[in-house]
């Protein structure tokens, strides 16, 4: 189930956001703009510097294995959490329980694409997505693509694994009331691994080599 489908079918859905880093906080704040009840959790003992909207509850020092997943309609996962690491403070247990109970799992990439789909249904102006991934060279390539398009006179937004997170860039554009002609996205393997509802107009895969094996667990 996509986020858009859930928002249509369920009144005030309860959503769990795992990880309170840059991506996790952006996801929680984006979801707070809808009629959602959000629990933002992190295994670390941290304090958030910014005040959160009233429909977000933050739980630091959380043991993921003790979360009652059945009360949630959906789970959003931060890219730093590996689905392979089998500790009580990681995502393996949540991934298995969500699968067992049919609870959808989304990433920031999925939420970003859902937001663009919602906008596309309300306007005739459609932004194109250029997504770049690979082991090496992503930042160089997205910077070149951005500069090429800007030199051709297009409004371009660079986001993702470089500079501004996807949803932070999206919310800033919404505030300004102007969407770009092109979104140029740098996406890591972490961001794409669990994404299930993302489509780009142009996809670029640069290269693959052994890297981040602590996250991927094997080659």
Say what each PLM segment does:
Residues 36-51:
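NAD(P)-binding Rossmann-fold cofactor-contacting core
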Residues 53-67:
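Glycine-rich, highly charged phosphate/nucleotide-binding loops
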Residues 23, 46, 190:
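Conserved Rossmann-like nucleotide-cofactor binding loop
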Residues 13-26:
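Glycine-rich adenosine-cofactor-binding loop
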Residues 13, 32-33, 65-70, 79, ...:
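Phosphate-binding loop of NTP-binding sites
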Residues 21, 44, 162:
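Residues in the short beta-alpha loop(s) of Rossmann-like NAD(P)-binding domains
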């Amino acid at each position: 189930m996509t986020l858009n489908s859930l928002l249509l079918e369920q009144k005030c859905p309860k959503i769990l956001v795992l990880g309170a880093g840059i991506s996790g906080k952006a996801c929680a704040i984006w979801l707070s703009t809808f009629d959602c009840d959000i629990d933002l959790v992190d295994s670390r003992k941290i304090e958030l510097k910014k005040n959160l909207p009233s429909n977000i509850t933050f739980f630091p020092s959380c043991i993921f294995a003790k979360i009652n997943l059945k009360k949630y309609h959906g789970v959003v996962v931060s890219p730093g959490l590996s689905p392979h690491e089998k500790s009580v403070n990681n995502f393996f247990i949540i991934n298995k329980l969500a699968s067992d109970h049919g609870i959808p799992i989304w990433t920031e990439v999925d939420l970003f694409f859902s937001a663009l789909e919602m906008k596309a249904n309300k306007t005739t102006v459609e932004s194109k997505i250029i997504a770049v991934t690979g082991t090496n060279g992503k930042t160089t390539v997205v910077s070149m693509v951005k500069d090429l398009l800007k030199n051709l006179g297009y409004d371009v937004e660079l986001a993702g694994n470089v500079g501004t997170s996807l949803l932070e860039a999206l919310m800033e554009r919404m505030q300004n009331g102007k969407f770009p002609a092109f979104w140029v996205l740098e996406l890591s393997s972490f961001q794409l691994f669990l994404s299930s509802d993302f489509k780009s107009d142009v996809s670029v895969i640069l290269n693959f080599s052994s890297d981040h094996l602590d996250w991927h667990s094997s080659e």
